[in-house]
């Protein structure tokens, strides 16, 4: 048949099949580890679904919710198509306000600029609020290697810093940590009462511990939820007020943002602030929405605008909407895969649907294995407040895998085999006739490293007769006949 049909023959070493199969299941293996603690996995799933439910309740209380989503998407697409114009306008206004604006093309340049500023001012104690950009660029380890003490002031981030862990969620960084673990950590680090796991007590202990760190900081840093071109404002949204506390004492303050955070004006900002907290945590608005415009009297205010691969996305029409993201985390809260596998099962530092897309945009050869962590249920696309077509983009990235040389060899062989059979009815029917033999095979033959599909699923029993065979034997009856 192969000779007659002039079908291509590909020679593949068995080691290649095994290696690709193994590489393609990094997420599955990490998720398996997460699921070993069934109680924690169930709690993680239920907690995030509760946040999703709060988001739904809040969105239904705003009659113009869909109109806001459409407007936000339009504003983001406008901003992303006018980035140079808006960023230069921001620089002009921020400079007029007294800020010093820097541009960083990549993570290395960003880290170097921050260090240069701190080093010039002889800073050794540095406090910062939550910034996913700092995580993206590896700022903390970069500074600490050079003798600068970095303190995270966000409570969740501070807990993780003391535990030497990375965030597992972009809004709820310590969502995977139980209060009992926090109590034990604070007992060790802060001398709290043994066995006291009361959240209020632990929060007060953290507040007391952070107070002297705020007062003794020589410089402070914030990220940015938004940067307003028309005013030169940096806008930071928090529930703890830690960004305001951090910037209130030191004379030296730094803000940094990825260039996609730019919005045209304050009217546009109002659209996003109505969507952000409702989508992220189910609140009408964050407790604090702070505008930073100019340096303190006698101080300096530095603003760093970072590219780090963002401009490259502008040349990818299928994926440009990724730049719409406002980092609300709603896609993670709704994603059935993320909720049941945890943030550490992904290889990119941002997990969930948006992390899959950002990782592929940043380095597809490195992060392609995350593409398997999606069921294409489309829930992420449905809840995104700025209408990023997350699931559709994941599907498009999957289609690009073969061109990247990262398509799973085992799956390619299986798909090619199915195509071959389905184009030849006689062979297909013969395969169906032989299929029940699989039912009696030992498990190691059905579930192994060659079978990615079977790693998380049970193969159903093959029927002794196919529908086609039953039809030919008049065993199939319509509704009227069966009556």
Outline where the language-model segments fall:
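The feature marks the mature, well-folded catalytic cores of soluble enzymes
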Residues: 21-318
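Intrinsic disorder at enzyme termini
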Residues: 27, 40-47, 414, 420-483
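Ferredoxin-type iron-sulfur electron-transfer modules in oxidoreductases and energy-metabolism complexes
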Residues: 288, 296-322, 338-444
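Extended amphipathic alpha-helical segments enriched in small hydrophobics
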Residues: 328-332, 377
């Amino acid at each position: 048949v192969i000779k007659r049909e002039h079908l291509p023959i590909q020679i593949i070493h068995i080691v290649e099949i095994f290696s690709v199969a193994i590489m393609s299941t990094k997420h599955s293996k990490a998720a398996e580890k997460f699921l070993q603690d069934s109680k924690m996995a169930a709690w993680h799933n239920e907690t995030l679904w509760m946040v999703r439910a709060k988001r739904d309740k809040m969105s239904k209380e705003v009659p113009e919710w869909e109109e806001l989503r459409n407007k936000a998407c339009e504003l983001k697409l406008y901003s992303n198509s006018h980035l140079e114009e808006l960023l230069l306008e921001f620089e002009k206004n921020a400079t007029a306000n007294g800020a010093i604006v820097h541009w960083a093309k990549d993570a290395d340049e960003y880290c170097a600029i921050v260090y240069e500023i701190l080093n010039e001012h002889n800073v050794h104690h540095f406090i910062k609020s939550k910034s996913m950009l700092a995580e993206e660029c590896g700022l903390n380890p970069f500074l600490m290697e050079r003798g600068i003490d970095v303190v995270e002031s966000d409570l969740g981030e501070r807990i993780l810093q003391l535990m030497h862990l990375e965030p597992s969620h972009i809004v709820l960084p310590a969502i995977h940590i139980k209060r009992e673990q926090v109590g034990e950590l604070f007992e060790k680090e802060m001398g709290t009462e043994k066995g006291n796991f009361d959240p209020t007590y632990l929060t007060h202990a953290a507040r007391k511990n952070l107070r002297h760190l705020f007062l003794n900081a020589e410089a402070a840093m914030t990220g940015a939820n938004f940067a307003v071109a028309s005013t030169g404002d940096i806008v930071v949204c928090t529930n703890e007020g830690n960004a305001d506390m951090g910037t209130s004492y030191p004379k030296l303050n730094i803000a940094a943002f990825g260039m996609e955070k730019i919005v045209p004006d304050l009217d546009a900002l109002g659209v996003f602030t109505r969507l952000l907290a409702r989508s992220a945590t189910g609140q009408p608005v964050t407790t604090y929405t702070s505008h930073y415009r100019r340096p303190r009297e006698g101080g300096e205010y530095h603003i760093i605008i970072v590219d780090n691969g963002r401009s490259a996305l502008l040349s990818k029409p299928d994926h440009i909407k990724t730049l719409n993201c406002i980092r609300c985390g709603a896609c993670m809260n709704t994603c059935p895969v993320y909720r049941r596998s945890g943030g550490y099962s992904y290889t990119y530092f941002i997990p969930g649907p948006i992390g899959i897309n950002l990782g592929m945009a940043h380095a597809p050869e490195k992060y392609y294995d995350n593409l398997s962590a999606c069921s294409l249920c489309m829930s992420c696309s449905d809840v995104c407040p700025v209408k990023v077509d997350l699931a559709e983009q994941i599907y498009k990235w999957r289609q690009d895998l073969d061109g990247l040389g990262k398509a799973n060899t085992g799956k390619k062989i299986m798909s090619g085999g199915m195509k071959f059979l389905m184009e030849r009815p006689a062979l297909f029917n013969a395969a169906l006739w032989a299929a029940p033999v699989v039912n009696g095979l030992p498990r190691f033959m059905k579930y192994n490293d060659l079978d990615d599909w079977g790693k998380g699923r049970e193969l159903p029993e093959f029927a002794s007769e196919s529908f086609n065979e039953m039809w030919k034997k008049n065993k199939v009856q319509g509704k009227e006949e069966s009556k």
